[in-house]
Protein backbone atom coordinates (compact mmCIF):
# COMPACT_ATOMS: atom_id res chain seq x y z
CA UNK A 1 0.00 0.00 0.00
CA UNK A 2 1.29 3.43 -0.89
CA UNK A 3 2.01 6.05 1.72
CA UNK A 4 0.21 9.38 1.70
CA UNK A 5 3.36 11.26 0.64
CA UNK A 6 3.80 8.97 -2.36
CA UNK A 7 0.17 9.46 -3.42
CA UNK A 8 0.50 13.24 -3.07
CA UNK A 9 3.75 13.26 -5.04
CA UNK A 10 2.18 11.17 -7.79
CA UNK A 11 -0.79 13.54 -7.90
CA UNK A 12 1.45 16.61 -8.00
CA UNK A 13 3.58 15.23 -10.83
CA UNK A 14 0.50 14.29 -12.87
CA UNK A 15 -1.07 17.70 -12.22
CA UNK A 16 2.12 19.47 -13.24
CA UNK A 17 2.38 17.47 -16.48
CA UNK A 18 -1.28 18.07 -17.34
CA UNK A 19 -1.04 21.79 -16.59
CA UNK A 20 2.15 22.19 -18.59
CA UNK A 21 0.80 20.18 -21.52
CA UNK A 22 -2.50 22.05 -21.56
CA UNK A 23 -0.78 25.43 -21.41
CA UNK A 24 1.64 24.60 -24.23
CA UNK A 25 -1.12 23.04 -26.39
CA UNK A 26 -3.36 26.07 -25.90
CA UNK A 27 -0.53 28.51 -26.70
CA UNK A 28 0.41 26.58 -29.84
CA UNK A 29 -3.21 26.40 -31.00
CA UNK A 30 -3.49 30.16 -30.55
CA UNK A 31 -0.20 30.70 -32.39
CA UNK A 32 -1.50 28.55 -35.28
CA UNK A 33 -4.72 30.59 -35.14
CA UNK A 34 -6.91 27.53 -34.70
CA UNK A 35 -10.50 28.62 -34.00
CA UNK A 36 -11.06 26.72 -30.74
CA UNK A 37 -7.76 26.23 -28.85
CA UNK A 38 -9.68 24.84 -25.89
CA UNK A 39 -9.97 21.49 -27.73
CA UNK A 40 -6.16 21.24 -27.83
CA UNK A 41 -6.03 22.08 -24.13
CA UNK A 42 -8.65 19.45 -23.26
CA UNK A 43 -6.95 16.77 -25.38
CA UNK A 44 -3.64 17.36 -23.61
CA UNK A 45 -5.23 17.05 -20.17
CA UNK A 46 -7.36 14.00 -20.95
CA UNK A 47 -4.50 11.85 -22.29
CA UNK A 48 -1.81 12.88 -19.78
CA UNK A 49 -0.55 10.14 -17.49
CA UNK A 50 2.63 9.57 -15.47
CA UNK A 51 3.45 6.55 -17.59
CA UNK A 52 4.46 7.18 -21.22
CA UNK A 53 2.85 3.93 -22.38
CA UNK A 54 -0.46 4.91 -20.83
CA UNK A 55 -0.27 8.42 -22.32
CA UNK A 56 0.33 6.80 -25.71
CA UNK A 57 -2.61 4.42 -25.29
CA UNK A 58 -4.95 7.17 -24.13
CA UNK A 59 -3.79 9.40 -26.98
CA UNK A 60 -4.42 6.72 -29.60
CA UNK A 61 -7.89 6.04 -28.18
CA UNK A 62 -8.70 9.75 -28.18
CA UNK A 63 -7.33 10.25 -31.70
CA UNK A 64 -9.27 7.31 -33.12
CA UNK A 65 -12.43 8.43 -31.34
CA UNK A 66 -12.09 11.99 -32.63
CA UNK A 67 -11.61 10.75 -36.18
CA UNK A 68 -14.59 8.37 -35.93
CA UNK A 69 -16.82 11.04 -34.40
CA UNK A 70 -15.81 13.66 -36.97
CA UNK A 71 -16.39 11.24 -39.85
CA UNK A 72 -19.80 10.20 -38.52
CA UNK A 73 -20.84 13.80 -38.01
CA UNK A 74 -19.75 14.89 -41.49
CA UNK A 75 -21.27 11.89 -43.26
CA UNK A 76 -24.60 12.26 -41.48
CA UNK A 77 -24.65 16.01 -42.12
CA UNK A 78 -24.02 15.32 -45.80
CA UNK A 79 -26.87 12.78 -45.97
CA UNK A 80 -29.56 14.26 -43.71
CA UNK A 81 -30.46 17.71 -42.41
CA UNK A 82 -29.20 17.89 -38.81
CA UNK A 83 -32.11 17.66 -36.38
CA UNK A 84 -32.35 16.36 -32.84
CA UNK A 85 -32.84 12.74 -33.90
CA UNK A 86 -29.95 12.97 -36.38
CA UNK A 87 -27.64 14.23 -33.63
CA UNK A 88 -28.71 11.30 -31.45
CA UNK A 89 -28.17 8.91 -34.35
CA UNK A 90 -24.69 10.35 -34.92
CA UNK A 91 -23.81 9.81 -31.27
CA UNK A 92 -25.14 6.25 -31.40
CA UNK A 93 -23.27 5.35 -34.60
CA UNK A 94 -19.97 6.94 -33.51
CA UNK A 95 -20.02 5.23 -30.11
CA UNK A 96 -21.05 1.87 -31.60
CA UNK A 97 -18.22 2.01 -34.15
CA UNK A 98 -15.73 2.68 -31.34
CA UNK A 99 -16.95 -0.37 -29.43
CA UNK A 100 -16.86 -2.58 -32.53
CA UNK A 101 -13.34 -1.36 -33.42
CA UNK A 102 -12.06 -1.95 -29.86
CA UNK A 103 -11.78 1.77 -29.05
CA UNK A 104 -14.27 1.58 -26.18
CA UNK A 105 -12.20 3.98 -24.09
CA UNK A 106 -12.89 6.72 -26.62
CA UNK A 107 -16.55 5.98 -27.36
CA UNK A 108 -17.92 8.94 -25.40
CA UNK A 109 -15.47 11.28 -27.11
CA UNK A 110 -16.58 9.97 -30.51
CA UNK A 111 -20.21 10.64 -29.64
CA UNK A 112 -19.35 14.13 -28.42
CA UNK A 113 -17.33 14.99 -31.54
CA UNK A 114 -20.07 13.68 -33.83
CA UNK A 115 -22.62 15.91 -32.09
CA UNK A 116 -20.31 18.95 -32.16
CA UNK A 117 -19.72 18.52 -35.89
CA UNK A 118 -23.45 18.12 -36.57
CA UNK A 119 -24.08 21.30 -34.57
CA UNK A 120 -21.37 23.29 -36.37
CA UNK A 121 -23.31 26.51 -36.75
CA UNK A 122 -21.90 28.92 -39.31
CA UNK A 123 -19.14 26.59 -40.48
CA UNK A 124 -19.17 23.84 -43.03
CA UNK A 125 -18.98 20.54 -41.13
CA UNK A 126 -15.90 19.41 -43.09
CA UNK A 127 -14.06 22.52 -41.90
CA UNK A 128 -15.34 22.11 -38.36
CA UNK A 129 -14.33 18.43 -38.30
CA UNK A 130 -10.89 19.26 -39.68
CA UNK A 131 -10.28 21.86 -36.97
CA UNK A 132 -11.44 19.51 -34.17
CA UNK A 133 -9.11 16.83 -35.47
CA UNK A 134 -6.21 19.29 -35.83
CA UNK A 135 -6.70 20.70 -32.34
CA UNK A 136 -6.93 17.21 -30.86
CA UNK A 137 -3.78 16.05 -32.66
CA UNK A 138 -1.94 19.10 -31.36
CA UNK A 139 -3.02 18.47 -27.75
CA UNK A 140 -2.19 14.77 -27.91
CA UNK A 141 1.17 15.50 -29.53
CA UNK A 142 2.12 17.88 -26.74
CA UNK A 143 1.05 15.34 -24.10
CA UNK A 144 3.11 12.64 -25.82
CA UNK A 145 6.18 14.88 -25.85
CA UNK A 146 5.75 15.75 -22.18
CA UNK A 147 5.40 12.05 -21.34
CA UNK A 148 8.97 11.61 -22.59
CA UNK A 149 10.31 13.96 -19.90
CA UNK A 150 11.52 11.89 -16.94
CA UNK A 151 9.47 12.20 -13.78
CA UNK A 152 10.79 14.44 -11.03
CA UNK A 153 11.06 11.51 -8.64
CA UNK A 154 10.78 7.86 -9.69
CA UNK A 155 7.92 6.23 -7.84
CA UNK A 156 8.50 2.61 -8.81
CA UNK A 157 11.07 0.37 -10.49
CA UNK A 158 9.37 0.37 -13.93
CA UNK A 159 8.78 4.04 -14.78
CA UNK A 160 7.53 3.37 -18.30
CA UNK A 161 4.65 1.06 -17.32
CA UNK A 162 1.64 1.68 -15.08
CA UNK A 163 1.34 -0.46 -11.96
CA UNK A 164 -0.69 -3.63 -12.35
CA UNK A 165 -3.52 -4.46 -10.03
Model region roles, listed by residue range:
Residues 1-165:
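Alpha-helical transmembrane segments and their membrane-interface boundaries
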Amino acid sequence: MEGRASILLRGFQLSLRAALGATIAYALAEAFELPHPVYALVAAIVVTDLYPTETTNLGLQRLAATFIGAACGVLLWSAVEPREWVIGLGILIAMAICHVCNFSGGAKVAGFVSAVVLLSYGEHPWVHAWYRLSETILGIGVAWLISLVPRLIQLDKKPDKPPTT
